[in-house]
A protein has these predicted regions:
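Alpha-helical interface subdomain recognition
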Residues: 1-95, 103-105, 117-122, 129-134, ...
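Hydrophobic, small-residue-rich alpha-helical packing segments that form membrane-like cores
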Residues: 146-150, 165
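A short, Trp-centered hydrophobic/proline-enriched beta-strand micro-motif
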Residues: 133-142, 187
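Flexible, glycine-rich active-site loops centered on histidine and acidic residues
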Residues: 110-117, 140, 194
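Flexible, small-/acidic-enriched active-site or ligand-binding loops
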Residues: 153, 211-239
Length: 404
């Protein structure tokens, strides 16, 4: 199995790497300063202006919507495996690069849903402005009052009333909902509680300005507020046209599974890129600091941290690339075990590598003088987002037991 980038992907990868070196990394201090200013002004979820500038550069260089698959854009589209290499590079500056190239979650997954399952009218109204970067979106699935790791527990109701659907319920960890550019939610709820377990749920498009939709609060992660915000949202008699249904009634669970396959590749490769950045920082710090008469890089315990990090990152990358190649060759359903495995492995590796980098940095590692603490918060949250480790381990074990 060849896990390297194709000729087309190699060309894009070179251009993305140059874009990162020439534009993204130099913009990081400006981004941090602008975020601080926006927070002090009471608008923490507004986009720092420097990112808009980077978006224009990326678009002008043809580095826009690179996540789109070959089936969508045969002239420019990449396979899942090819885009995975690019996702890793963008993960090295995870707060800036994906947004600058219009490849941010949850927009990428939402765009894929609209492309695969949306009507022509839905695509014209929502997919086109998302592809153009004029709006942002969110995905409302997790709920505070039930164990959402079991998606069949979802309690939010979507009830048909004439030509409309009426929505009642509460969602949280709705990523992107605080961004003022967020115009649309894809919401998963129950349309038929009496149906077969995996046919009870449906997905509908809910504009953010719909009466009855209220963002109650922004949820921080370990005290850090995501730039786009994680929202808790209530739906109190929110009414949308029946034409906002995605696919058919009862298809919500199947659509969710289709959405999460490639998205998990993107998440995991970005985590690997983030881990590589943390390893770079660990090595740089170990060479600069002297303790007990010699650089930290000459201390055996620090060398062990560096070596373990190198091993674990490479293992995670190979496993993720195998999963990506399987999605391309046999489809998401057949790659289910490998997709579950990477969702466990990649965030854990990122957490472990970042934690070692924090340790080598000492007190600076847990301060805001380095990005490591924020990096750790983001990586740790991914062990819960899109399903906690335990659910994926359960699925892997189930598949193994069936094979024996």
């Amino acid at each position: 199995m060849d896990l390297g980038p194709s000729a087309r992907a190699s060309e894009y990868l070179s251009r993305v790497t140059t874009f990162m070196d020439d534009n993204v990394y130099p913009a990081e201090p400006t981004y941090a300063e602008q975020r601080r200013t926006l927070t002090e002004q009471g608008t923490p979820h507004h986009l720092p202006p420097v990112v808009e500038e980077l978006k224009e550069v990326a678009r002008s260089q043809g580095l826009w919507n690179l996540f789109l698959p070959e089936s969508t854009d045969p002239a420019h589209g990449l396979t899942v495996a090819d885009y995975a290499h690019i996702a890793e590079v963008t993960g090295r500056s995870i707060e800036i690069a994906p947004e600058a190239m219009n490849c941010s979650a949850p927009d990428t997954g939402n765009m894929e849903v609209l492309h695969m399952f949306g009507t022509d009218a839905q695509r014209a109204q929502w997919l086109e402005p998302l592809l153009d970067g004029r709006i942002r979106s969110s995905f409302a699935m997790t709920e505070p009052d039930v164990a959402s790791s079991d998606a069949t527990n979802i309690a939010t109701r979507i009830e048909r009333d004439g030509d409309d659907y009426v929505i009642n319920g509460r969602k949280w960890w709705t990523t992107g909902a605080l961004d003022p550019r967020c115009a649309i939610l894809i919401l998963m709820g129950k349309t038929d509680p009496g149906a077969e377990t995996h046919r009870q749920q449906s997905m509908v498009l809910v504009p953010m300005d719909t009466p009855g939709v209220t963002v109650q609060r922004s949820l921080p992660v370990f005290g850090y507020h995501d730039q786009h915000g994680h929202g808790e949202i209530t739906f109190d008699g929110a009414r949308v046209p029946a034409s906002n249904l995605i696919g058919e009634e009862g298809a919500g669970f199947a659509i969710a599974q289709a959405r999460l396959g490639p998205g998990r590749i993107h998440h995991c490769m970005r985590m690997i890129g983030l881990a590589e950045r943390a390893l770079d920082m660990m090595i740089d710090r170990s060479r600069e600091r002297v303790a007990f008469g010699k650089p930290l890089s000459d201390q055996g315990v620090v060398r062990e941290s560096i070596a373990l990090s190198r091993i674990e990152i490479d293992q995670a990358r190979l496993l993720t690339m195998k999963a990506a190649a399987l999605i391309d060759s046999v489809g998401t359903k057949a790659a289910r075990t490998e997709i579950a495995a990477i969702k466990v492995v990649a965030p854990r590796v990122a957490c472990d590598v970042i934690d070692r980098a924090i340790q080598v940095h000492g007190g600076a590692g847990v301060s805001d003088d380095t990005p490591l603490a924020a990096m750790y918060a983001g990586a740790r949250s991914l062990r819960l987002a899109d399903g906690p480790d335990e659910v994926h381990l359960r699925d892997i074990a189930r598949q193994e037991l069936r094979r024996r």
